[in-house]
């Protein structure tokens, strides 16, 4: 599972430019196409322009955080079935139960994240 011959599209959402740059480079090296957004509102707009195969989003961001993005994502019939991975360097509030598929605490190893992505995009719709 080291490559992605189908060129699946990953939407990476994070307000830290270095994170976006690193993930873009690593995912593209593995054969994925990558789009990025700096907050949840930008991510929703990007997904309207080009529907991704999966989204990897940070939790703590300005404008619209990752939890609010996930709720809006699931409420949109065109996006609801797309797998959603939420990440955070902080601790999520105990009552935060948005309908994300997986959660990883940062820092998460790229190999762990990549394996989860392959698992989620390979599952039947």
Spans of features found by a protein language model:
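Hydrophobic/aromatic residues positioned on beta-strands within the core alpha/beta folds
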Residues: 87-88
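Acidic catalytic/metal-coordinating carboxylates
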Residues: 38-42, 65-69
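Active-site residues of response regulator receiver
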Residues: 14, 58
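Two-component/phosphorelay signaling modules centered on CheY-like receiver
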Residues: 17-35
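Active-site beta3 strand of CheY-like receiver
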Residues: 50-56
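A Lys-centered signature of the CheY-like receiver
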Residues: 106
């Amino acid at each position: 599972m080291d490559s992605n011959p189908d060129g699946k599209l990953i939407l990476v959402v994070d307000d830290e430019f270095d994170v976006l740059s690193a993930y873009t480079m690593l995912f593209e090296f593995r054969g994925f196409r990558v789009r990025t957004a700096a907050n949840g509102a930008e991510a929703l707009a990007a997904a309207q322009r080009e529907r991704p195969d999966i989204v990897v989003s940070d939790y703590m961001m300005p404008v619209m955080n990752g939890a609010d993005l996930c709720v809006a994502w699931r409420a949109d019939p065109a996006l609801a079935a797309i797998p959603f991975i939420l990440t955070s360097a902080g601790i999520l509030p105990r009552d935060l139960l948005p309908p994300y598929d997986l959660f990883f605490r940062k820092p998460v190893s790229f190999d762990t994240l990549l394996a989860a992505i392959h698992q989620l995009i390979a599952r039947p719709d």
